[in-house]
Amino acid sequence: MALTDTQVYVALVIALLPAVLAFRLSTELYK
């Protein structure tokens, strides 16, 4: 099962979104 470029990018976005949100939340809390 080969991944297409689109599937790879979608998976990256899905993985990165929670990480970015958590990072922004932590920076807000620890200001």
Swiss-Prot record:
GO cellular component: photosystem I; plasma membrane-derived thylakoid membrane
Entry membrane topology: Single-pass membrane protein
Pfam families with a match to the protein in the record: PsaM
Membrane-spanning intervals of the chain: 7-26
Any one GO BP annotation for this protein: photosynthesis
Compartments where located: Cellular thylakoid membrane
UniProtKB keywords: Membrane, Photosynthesis, Photosystem I, Thylakoid, Transmembrane, Transmembrane helix
Family label: Belongs to the PsaM family.
Protein name as catalogued: Photosystem I reaction center subunit XII
Organism whose genome encodes this protein: Thermosynechococcus vestitus (strain NIES-2133 / IAM M-273 / BP-1)
Native organism taxonomy: Bacteria, Bacillati, Cyanobacteriota, Cyanophyceae, Acaryochloridales
Gene: psaM
